[in-house]
Amino acid sequence: MSKAYEESGVNIQAGYEAVERITSHVERTLRKEVLGGLGGFGATFDLSQLKMKAPVLVSGTDGVGTKLKLAIDYGKHDTIGIDAVAMCVNDILTTGAEPLYFLDYIATNKVVPSTIEQIVKGISDGCEQTNTALIGGETAEMGEMYHEGEYDIAGFAVGAVEKEDYIDGSNVEEGQAIIGLASSGIHSNGYSLVRKMIKESGVQLHDQFNGQTFLETFLAPTKLYVKPILELKKHIDIKAMSHITGGGFYENIPRALPKGLSAKIDTQSFPTLEVFNWLQKQGNISTNEMYNIFNMGIGYTIIVDKKDVQTTLTTLRAMDTTAYEIGEIIKDDDTPIHLLEVE
């Protein structure tokens, strides 16, 4: 190892140890289409093995935001990687694409092999749960860019869908139903506000809240919707989908709608998670604003024909996914979303 490089703040040996630690986690995610192994200059994936007639590649990249601060402050590094995967694969899933592979980027003040292993374990868990290969990544040690103990992670996912099956919302029509899939909690958005509420409330994160600790509640990994949605695609014609992330209902559901149509949502048709009630009370936040920030208990929405509602609910529930009929599509040139019972 270069002594000069070490004196500048880069520990190459720690990097080597981190790679050794993560190898077994990465290997459990690999699919048969992956060519080669770790250590190459570029990762390779054989699309021909998918047996698609006209594959369309769909890509997405994202991070975890300031949820990371909670994970770092409380030394809980083994699930934040699931969030990084979920934020990417849930996004590309909205086109009907099956996620194929994932790459990660970790930047840190100092490479601590045990911490890197925990982060990559979480990433690998998310990849394994969605049959997505973790085929590459980068860990950068940048002591001058981050404070001690800090790190940031970002992910990049690629999926594929048959061109004729690509979902873009163009087949959405008046009268179709909106199905909401339950979230696992806050997911990965709104954490600057969450952390502000934690600080102002003075709550101790190891205290109990609704059957678990506050910390477990706030760090609950983002739900992965890949398997239930890919299964549902085999049974019905999905018209459009939305991943409820930053901007809540107001920002994300209209993204799936053609001009002239609007989503009418009955907010009494699904339960609001207790964590959102707590946040709203602590921050004295209006219900309208809450729906403009958080998922409020619905992390993903799909639009289907009315005749397919029961099949949709039955299929999703058989995949251990809680789902509700939460609204319908109406004509409206001016307002892209109507939330009933919201002030």
Curated annotation (Swiss-Prot):
- Pfam families the record matches: AIRS, AIRS_C
Recorded catalytic reaction(s): these are: 2-formamido-N(1)-(5-O-phospho-beta-D-ribosyl)acetamidine + ATP = 5-amino-1-(5-phospho-beta-D-ribosyl)imidazole + ADP + phosphate + H(+)
Q: In which pathway does it act?
A: Purine metabolism; IMP biosynthesis via de novo pathway; 5-amino-1-(5-phospho-D-ribosyl)imidazole from N(2)-formyl-N(1)-(5-phospho-D-ribosyl)glycinamide: step 2/2
Q: Does the record carry Nucleotide-binding as a key word?
A: yes
* Xref: InterPro entries: PurM-like_C_dom, PurM-like_C_sf, PurM-like_N, PurM-like_N_sf, PurM_cligase
Q: A GO molecular function for this record?
A: phosphoribosylamine-glycine ligase activity
Give the enzyme's EC designation.
Answer: 6.3.3.1
Name the domain of life.
Answer: Bacteria
UniProt keywords (A-Z) are:
ATP-binding, Cytoplasm, Ligase, Nucleotide-binding, Purine biosynthesis
List the GO biological process terms: 'de novo' IMP biosynthetic process; adenine biosynthetic process
Compartments where located: Cytoplasm
One GO cellular-component annotation of the UniProt record comes to: cytosol
The Swiss-Prot or TrEMBL record describes its family as follows: Belongs to the AIR synthase family.
* Family annotation (HAMAP family): AIRS
Please give the name of this protein. Phosphoribosylformylglycinamidine cyclo-ligase
The source organism is Staphylococcus epidermidis (strain ATCC 35984 / DSM 28319 / BCRC 17069 / CCUG 31568 / BM 3577 / RP62A)
Gene that produces this protein: purM
